[in-house]
Regions:
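Disulfide-bonded cysteine-rich modules in secreted/extracellular proteins
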Residues: 33-36, 129, 148, 230, ...
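Bacterial Sec-dependent N-terminal signal peptides
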Residues: 1-17, 23
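Fold-core signature of tandem repeat domains
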Residues: 41, 46, 52-54, 58-63, ...
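Outer membrane beta-barrel translocator domains of Type V secretion systems
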Residues: 590-743
Length: 743
């Protein structure tokens, strides 16, 4: 009533619509219009601060005014006002427009565009927010509102929204508190459907009941969420928020943050429950294939397929980890009877303790030699003694990793696919260390193995060999000091694995080194080198070269035990791997230059040959043929190349063979007779291409040089009239675009 009074006070009077018939058509409304009870108005537009006050029925109105003071401002007085008993159907609200539905009023099928709004204290059914906003005030009920991109529904305290469909709000990324799109609930929201990109934010005083969240959508809970179903969507429960009865289905994810509480959560196959430090989840039902992600700093109580489990007060008991599940046992905390199945991860920090662990195929263990862990895996019993730093029987796979700290030792370790074994300086190996295909061992210092290393995976020195270095043909930045390391082992059996080593090829002749101490190197191991020196300054090696494999104390290395995994080049040199009679292996520079050197040496000659042929082509056109045309077009092609005249080492042009072709257009500017001589001047332009195959000094193919050329020139032609003698003077400039491709 107060809003109506303000509306009426806006102008001197109110124009009352005539009610001569039950239905009145109003093609153009007056400034203020009242639709009386029992009256129906079809169509019309509200603009320029107009009012329509509806006690009867208004159909098909377009509203473009009313938000003079901004969104959801009680000072707004224009637009369409639906009063107690009033009805509005099929209304369109455009930018700047306002539809106000007071208590007792009802609207249906309203479409609100960006910049428009609906203020609701009555009832609204089938509202569509196409970038527009709906403000549901105390006592208001919004049913089946569809919130599309950039639309926003605010359900205030004492208000209710039912069967809302949310298609916007999450574009800012997971759990981003943007709050200006999607649905914000301060009152009650029932049976909300949240689709991809949709977001529902439940404020501290709000309640959301029976929400369904699909993939790409999420629900942020600061208040209360009841009976939410996550069908691929996410639910974030923040400090002070509670979620009860959540069902997490495939690809769904419930995250309980510090201070958040979840009760009676059910996690089905491929669903995930994450409880952060300080978060609480009680009465959890974890079905087979469901994932639990938590740490011993959280509180989680419930049941899994093996029975009841608990995580509280720094202790975990009976936890099952699979399908992306993870338990972090923190320093000073403990876990017992943990089962780690396929896709599960048990991470034990230094000072943490995990006993009676069962690791099955596909499970991952993450620890270092400062943790205490004992249990069984696919290979049998395993253990880590956090006091002595001794580990035995570890199986690392599927993201599992173990770090041997200084003074620690790992014995009889198996590293499977996607597993990593890291050794600090002073860490050591014993027994059999097996690296499967896809496994990694990282050496951060000098490491000694007193047993055997069997390698089908990757060994990295200081983890400096990256994919970027591989793509750049094993060249790394040389602007930081490098400390080279040694890996010493009794025996090495190569099973097609790779050892990634660092080397300086700019004169220092130093590298990481593999030492075979008293045993054998057998099988096949690839050596991949990263040049950590100045990649533009390759220096020829001296003596035997750079020793990279050192056979000591009677050790032997099979011929073919090592090979380069990729070309190694620096400056002008190629480097090869060679085995000497002392069983050691060395990097040596080749006497021949690397393939790129003859290619670049050939470029200048190729360009000059082309330029000379193009400039000389002028004589054949006019001097010999005596053409009189002022403009001439010619096409020419032929062979281009050089014989072997001693090679680069003797300063000669590399041997090459190829072809050229060009199109030339020239035009005379002046023709005249001077002192018995015919004088002609003109200009020309040409576009051409040449391609030459280049050979190295040893006769092998080095690659191909291709040249796209554009030329401009001028000429002066003199012909002695009586004798026929002639001369051409040519000035020419050419832009060459050359590309060398080595074999």
């Amino acid at each position: 009533a107060s809003e109506l009074a303000r509306s009426r006070g806006k102008r001197a009077g109110v124009a009352v619509a005539l009610s001569l018939a039950a239905v009145t058509s109003v093609p153009a409304l007056a400034a203020d219009t009242v639709v009386q009870a029992g009256e129906t108005v079809n169509g019309g537009t509200l603009t320029n601060h107009d009012n329509q006050i509806v006690f009867g029925t208004a159909n098909g109105m377009t509203i473009s005014t009313g938000l003079e003071y901004g969104p959801d401002n009680e000072a707004n007085t224009g637009g369409q006002w639906i009063q107690n008993g009033g009805i509005a159907n099929n209304t369109t609200v455009t930018g700047g427009g306002l539809q106000r539905v007071n208590a007792g009023g009802s609207v249906s099928d309203t479409v609100i565009s960006a910049g428009g709004g609906q203020s609701l204290q009555g009832q609204a059914v089938n509202t569509t927010l196409n970038g527009g906003e709906q403000w549901v005030h105390e006592g208001g009920i919004a049913t089946v509102t569809v919130i599309n991109e950039k639309g926003w529904q605010a359900v205030k305290s004492g208000a209710m929204a039912t069967d809302t469909v949310v298609n916007t709000g999450a574009e800012g990324g997971p759990d981003a508190e943007n709050g200006d799109t999607g649905q914000n609930v301060y009152g009650d929201a029932v049976r909300t459907t949240i689709n991809k990109n949709g977001r529902q934010i439940v404020a501290a005083e709000g309640t959301a009941n029976t929400t369904v969240v699909y993939a790409g959508g999420d629900q942020t809970v600061h208040g209360h969420a009841l009976d939410t179903t996550l069908n691929g969507g996410y639910q974030y429960v923040h400090n002070g928020g509670t979620a009860s009865g959540t069902v997490v289905n495939s690809d769904g994810w419930q995250i309980i943050k510090e201070g958040g509480l979840a009760d009676f959560t059910t996690v089905n196959q491929k669903g995930k429950l994450q409880v952060n430090a300080g978060g609480t989840a009680t009465h959890v039902t974890l079905k087979q294939g469901g994932a639990l992600v938590t740490s011993t700093a959280a509180t989680v109580l419930g049941s899994n397929r093996l029975g009841n489990f608990t995580v509280e007060n720094g202790k975990a008991d009976g936890v099952v980890l699979e399908s992306g599940g993870r338990l972090d046992v923190l320093e000073g905390h403990s876990a017992q009877k943990t089962r780690v199945d396929d896709g599960g991860t048990l991470a034990v920090s230094a000072g943490g303790k995990a006993t009676d662990v069962t690791m099955t195929s596909g499970g991952a263990l993450i620890a270092d030699s400062g943790a205490t862990v004992e249990g069984t895996n696919a290979s049998g019993k395993f253990s880590i003694d956090g006091i002595s730093g001794q580990a035995s029987g570890l199986l690392l796979e599927n993201g599992g990793s173990f770090t041997v700290n200084a003074g620690g030792q790992a014995g009889n370790t198996t590293v499977g696919h996607r597993g990593t074994l890291t050794l600090a300086a002073g860490g050591s190996l014993s027994g059999r260390t097996q690296l499967s295909k896809g496994a990694s061992m990282v050496l951060n210092g000098d490491v000694v193995s007193t047993g055997d290393i069997v390698n089908a995976g990757e060994i990295h020195f200081d983890n400096q060999t990256t994919q970027d270095a591989v793509l750049s043909r094993a060249v790394a930045k040389g602007d930081s000091p490098v400390t080279f390391h040694k890996l010493t082992t009794t025996n090495l059996t190569g099973q097609g694995g790779t050892i990634n080593m660092r080397v300086r090829l700019d004169g220092s002749n130093t590298s990481d080194q593999l030492v075979i101490n008293g045993g054998q190197a057998t099988g096949k191991t690839w050596l991949a080198f990263t040049n950590v020196g100045n990649s533009n300054l390759g220096v020829a090696t001296t003596g035997q070269g750079i020793r990279v494999v050192d056979a000591q104390n009677g050790a032997t290395t099979e011929e073919g035990a090592f090979a380069l995994s990729r070309p190694l080049q620096a400056g002008a040199f190629n480097y090869t791997l060679n085995r000497d009679s002392d069983e050691d292996w060395y990097l040596r520079s080749e006497n021949a230059y690397r393939a790129e050197v003859p290619l670049y040496a050939s470029m200048l000659t190729q360009a000059m040959d082309y330029d000379r042929i193009l400039a000389g082509s002028r004589s054949h056109q006019t001097g010999v043929n005596g053409e009189n045309n002022s403009v001439r077009l010619s096409i020419q092609g032929g062979h281009l190349g050089h014989d072997n005249n001693g090679g680069i080492a003797r300063g000669a042009t590399p041997e090459s063979s190829g072809s050229y072709g060009f199109v030339r257009l020239e035009g005379d500017l002046l023709r005249t007779e001077v002192a018995g001589m015919s004088l002609t001047t003109g200009v020309y332009g040409a576009a051409g291409h040449s391609s030459v195959d280049v050979k190295d000094d040893d006769g092998s193919r080095a690659g191909t040089v291709r040249d796209d050329a554009g030329s401009l020139g001028g000429y002066l032609n003199l012909v002695h009239t009586s004798s026929g003698l002639w001369a051409d003077i040519v000035a020419q400039g050419t832009r060459h675009s050359m590309k060398a491709s080595s074999d």
